[in-house]
Design a protein with these regions (language model features):
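Conserved SET/PR-domain catalytic core that frames the SAM/AdoMet-binding pocket
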Residues: 34-44, 49, 292-294, 300-302, ...
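Solvent-exposed loop/turn segments at secondary-structure junctions
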Residues: 44-46, 108-109, 217, 237-239, ...
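Acidic glycine-/aspartate-rich tracts in secreted/extracellular proteins
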Residues: 45, 108, 118-122, 224, ...
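Short, solvent-exposed loop/turn elements at domain surfaces
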Residues: 46-56, 110-112, 239-242, 314-315, ...
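Short Gly/aromatic-enriched secondary-structure transition segments
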Residues: 52-64, 316-323
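Surface-exposed recognition segments
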Residues: 299-369
Length: 369
């Protein structure tokens, strides 16, 4: 274990030109991308908190839902086979959170999404942004319609060079349209306006997979006892919230809200989106940072958490295959076994609140990521 940056040297990779359709004399650009991940170890955990809306409860080998259930109706998930949801079988391959898994430490940042867009063809780009890649240089790429006020919605991704003919667009992020430095132009702010298909495409490209709602609860609560109505940071309430649009180092890699700590939409006080992990510092506790038991950031605040539910047939059919780095010609994920419809999300900050777990929402919105 440990903390802090890593300096890894001497890494090499081999690239077979012929396997990718290139001649030995061709010049190519190879880019390396890294995503910080958190390891969630194998262990039992408790599903549901007994009080949150539509919270899970487990009696014998059957999962069900219902707020107001007694604490003893919450069940320990042990990785057993033969589980059901309201009597419907949950396939053994469906990830229940008991086995170890990796999860992204942060939400997708605007810079990470720019990196993703800049590896796609023009046809693929057109599916992953609401504004056409052929729009004028410096056009907003993600903010659209009535959502283009950057001081409110805070998505600074722009078309740096418009697509022409069959040449893809080049994207960047710039608050004013002149300075394209990522560290001073919101590159570390979570990327809002992403819909379900955008997220799946990014995961396929990054060779990752979606997580399930049971894995969401495990990543948040860990193997610890339940605190009824708890948020990801392990307390029921009392967390101060970001109350204004006022920031220190706004748009920079060091951005923090002047009114800490968590940033959740329901209060009506906070801006739509902030820098990923904005409340975590060397000196902060888990409570102050808003982190989960394992140190995953923003699981109860900032943007919606999208996951694969256990309560619908489409969700239960999920097979946890990882992406392969390639998208379809039209820019969609094409991984066998992934849900065809939106798998639901966690908007409310209690980690067992399933109010939106079955929401089939395909639109883009300032609070979706």
């Amino acid at each position: 274990g440990g903390a802090g940056p890593n300096e890894i040297k001497g890494i090499k990779t081999k690239f077979n030109y012929a396997d990718h359709g290139y001649a030995p004399t061709d010049s190519i650009i190879v880019s390396v991308f890294a995503i910080e991940m958190v390891y969630i170890p194998k262990s039992t955990f408790i599903a549901g908190d007994g009080v949150s809306t539509n919270t899970l409860r487990k009696i014998d080998n059957d999962l069900s839902v219902g707020a107001g259930q007694q604490v003893w109706d919450m069940g320990i998930v042990k990785g057993e086979t033969g589980l059901t949801f309201k009597g419907e079988p949950i396939p053994d391959v469906y990830p229940k959170g008991f086995e170890a898994f990796y999860i992204m430490k942060h939400e997708i940042s605007q810079h990470a999404y720019v990196d993703f867009l800049n590896t796609l063809t023009q046809e693929q780009q057109a599916s992953r942004v609401p504004v056409k890649p052929t729009a004028a240089d410096k056009s907003w790429a993600m903010a659209f319609g009535s959502y283009t006020n950057p001081s409110v919605y805070r998505n600074y991704i722009r078309i740096r060079t418009a697509a022409i003919a069959d040449v893809a667009a080049i994207y960047g992020h710039s608050i004013g349209g002149t300075n394209w430095d990522r560290e001073s132009n919101g590159g570390n702010i979570a990327c809002n306006f992403l819909n379900w298909d955008d997220g799946l495409a990014y995961l396929d490209w990054a060779a990752l997979r979606p997580f399930t709602e049971l894995e969401y609860e495990k990543a948040g609560r860990g193997h610890k006892r339940v605190i009824r109505g708890e948020m990801a940071w392990g307390y029921k309430a009392g967390m101060p919230v970001a109350a204004t649009n006022s920031f220190t180092d706004a748009g920079l890699a060091s951005e923090v809200a002047k009114d800490p700590q968590a940033n959740y939409l329901e209060t009506g006080k906070a801006p739509w989106v902030m820098r990923v992990g904005a409340f975590a510092k060397d000196s902060t506790t888990r409570y102050e940072s808003g982190g989960t038991y394992y140190g995953v950031m923003n699981m109860s605040d900032n943007l919606w958490e999208r996951c694969v539910n256990v309560s619908t047939p489409d969700g239960r059919s999920f097979v946890p295959n990882h992406g392969d780095g390639y998208l379809s010609m039209t820019g969609t994920a094409d991984v066998d076994g992934w849900p065809s419809a939106a798998g639901g999300g966690f908007r409310s900050f209690q980690i067992s609140n399933r109010q939106y777990a079955e929401l089939n929402e395909t639109a883009r919105h300032p609070s979706y990521g």
